[in-house]
Every structure is written in structure tokens, then in C-alpha cells.
């Protein structure tokens, strides 16, 4: 493995998306293992993988990391002819986020775990608007930046980390959305109308006066 780009993105709901874009050289294996410290298994909601052409790769969650214990592993099938670059994505619940007096603490894997050494691992912790990083504590040293790098990342790296950051009130909303009903209509002229019905559960002690939604850039007549 020549390079891994490890991105940890905190969403406005407090959920976390971890994506690892992996570049390999030489002959591709039939399958590929990636893991995290086992404690994060309780928060994983979904995993998916795709190659550089966005073709979905079969993925199995909750497998053994060879003979190593203490890891939550996932196996990705690599079909013949796949590209040398592929991405693995995990969605974690907002249970990895806890409140502080002026913001939050994020419990996350500082690096992914592999069965072989990684030449270079680049890490980016992507926080929402209205937040400011205070520091990241990890086993190989603390940093006060949202980006850091590790050369020659050892196989079976076990590295939980904690990111502490301040946040403007209301920018992160501790909620769950258990149901979403979507209805899409296409008119004879080709116009598309989409109606979403959400059920939102507020997990915080304060009330929610507004909620942030991401819409397509070409969306119009939003009500």
C-alpha cells in the first residue's frame, strides 16, 4: 500500500463519515482487509466500498483481522481488472461525539488498520462550519491541527484518538432520523418534484429551532 487518504468528516447531525482512499501497487489481491479498534464496532451503521470508476465493490463487515484480536475488520472483494485506487467508507452514529462545556469531543480511529505496512497515510479531520479545533490526542503524539501525516504506518496499527473542538451553539444538532419517506414525481415535460418526510428525534437537552438540509445545487421552489 503506497498511500492512504484517511478522512474523518463530522456531519451537522454529529454522525461521522470515515473514508479511506487507498492506492496500491503490484498485483491486486482477491480480497482486502481494513479494520479499526473493536470499540468502534458499536457505532458503525453502514460500510461500502467502490473503485476509482465508482463501481461498488462487495464488502463484508465484522470479519477477523487474520489472527489479531481487538480489531473490527471488514473484507472487500477486488474483482479482476479493478483499478489500483479504491475507497472504503464507514458511517458511524453520533454516539462517538460527546459534549463539553464549549463544544465537543470526537472519539475516532486516528489511522485505519491494515495487514501490511502503509508507506504514507494522510489524515484530514473535516469539521462543520462554526467549529474550531482545539487539539487531537493520539497514541503517537498530540497535534493542534485537523491534518496530520504518518509515514510507514505499521501493520495492525491500533490507535484510538480524541479530537476536541469548540462549536457555535446550534451548528451541530445531536439528532437521529429513524425514518425518511421520499416521493419522486416526473411530469410529462420532464420536471422532477421530490417530497421528503422526515422523523427527527432530538437527543440533546436543548430544543431545536432550525435544521440544516443539503440540497442539490439546481434545486428550486424549495418549501
Regions found by a protein language model. Name each.
Residues 1-223:
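Lumenal/extracellular ectodomains and adaptor appendage modules
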Amino acid at each position: 500500500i503506497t498511500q492512504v487518504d484517511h478522512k474523518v468528516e463530522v456531519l451537522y447531525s454529529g454522525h461521522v463519515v470515515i473514508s479511506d482512499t487507498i492506492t496500491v501497487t503490484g498485483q491486486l489481491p482477491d480480497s482486502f482487509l481494513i479494520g479499526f479498534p473493536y470499540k468502534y464496532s458499536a457505532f458503525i451503521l453502514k460500510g461500502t466500498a467502490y473503485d476509482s470508476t465508482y463501481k461498488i465493490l462487495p464488502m463484508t463487515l465484522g470479519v477477523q483481522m487474520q489472527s489479531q484480536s481487538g480489531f473490527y475488520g471488514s473484507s472487500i472483494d477486488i474483482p479482476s481488472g479493478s483499478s489500483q485506487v479504491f475507497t472504503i467508507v464507514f458511517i458511524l452514529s453520533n454516539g462517538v461525539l460527546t459534549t463539553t462545556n464549549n463544544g465537543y469531543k470526537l472519539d475516532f480511529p486516528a489511522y485505519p488498520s491494515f495487514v501490511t505496512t502503509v508507506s504514507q497515510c494522510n489524515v484530514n479531520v473535516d469539521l462543520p462550519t462554526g467549529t474550531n479545533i482545539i487539539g487531537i490526542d493520539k497514541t503517537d503524539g498530540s497535534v493542534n491541527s485537523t491534518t496530520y501525516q504518518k509515514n510507514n504506518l505499521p501493520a495492525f496499527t491500533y490507535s484510538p484518538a480524541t479530537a476536541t473542538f469548540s462549536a457555535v451553539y446550534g451548528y451541530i444538532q445531536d439528532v437521529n432520523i429513524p425514518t425518511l419517506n421520499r416521493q419522486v414525481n416526473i411530469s410529462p415535460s420532464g420536471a422532477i418534484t421530490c417530497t421528503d418526510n422526515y422523523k427527527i428525534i432530538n437527543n440533546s437537552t436543548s430544543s431545536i429551532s432550525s435544521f440544516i438540509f443539503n440540497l442539490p445545487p439546481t434545486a428550486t421552489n424549495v418549501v
